[in-house]
């Protein structure tokens, strides 16, 4: 009880600091519960404090808006960044609020939180389930925590790295992308939390997934005119890298057109054999061939596509469409063959997905 009270006190402090109570949000009399489906994270407008979390149940075609607000009587915060599902918990990273919430995925209630972070980006948990990591954009420190107690345990300072982005666990290795103004992947040993390797990829690596063959796929956006790149590193075209998780050697690099951009991060299906991303359309790469197909899987009108997720069981494809980036967005659900199944409205700037089956 004391622990829960402490968590709620910290949550209250965060609320007073910027996540103000949502008095205008109606509260359901019945307790809301979630038993499957997908959570959709909506980024909201930077500095407006209007991030939101939605839930969709595909079998019942039910949409629940403002999951966090309804469960905790507080707003989620400013500029929600990512989701991570683990052992009955849904970790929600809220970048500009400097906080990570651990929610009960069946109720949306806060079970723990980590605050006073420096622009947090992603969460990863090691294979033993005893160590958690939080990446941060504007500092070389990666925060560590115990997923069992939801208590912070310390931090790791990355040598030669200004900030960290998406992370991937493979065995006792933690791969950390350094997106902002850099071109490196850092590797930690999760048993010792020691930095064991750093290798170069394209400019500004920001998204990674691991396939069933222990291959690490990395998207690099190539930088832009605002990037403050290290000496000797210049802006380049976006690229997709295929890298051995064991040796850290690149076995293939796909170069895209200069001036182009990836509209989503990478996603992979539950069997780990098909890679998905949005460039100018939705593309799917069969890892057996490792080749970019001649035609995209799905073509969508407009320029609002902002995120992609793959249901690990049904392999349905979820596309987050931010529309005009100023009004409510939409999620489009497709079959793995690229046929549209249904659509549903969500909040402002939808971008990330987390599935119950994960």
Regions from the PLM with identified roles:
Residues 1-4:
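Positively charged n-region of N-terminal signal peptides that target proteins for export
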Residues 6-11:
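Sec-dependent N-terminal signal peptides
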Residues 20-358:
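Predominantly soluble domains enriched in secretory-pathway, periplasmic, or organellar proteins
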Residues 15-18:
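C-terminal motif of bacterial Sec signal peptides marking the signal peptidase cleavage site
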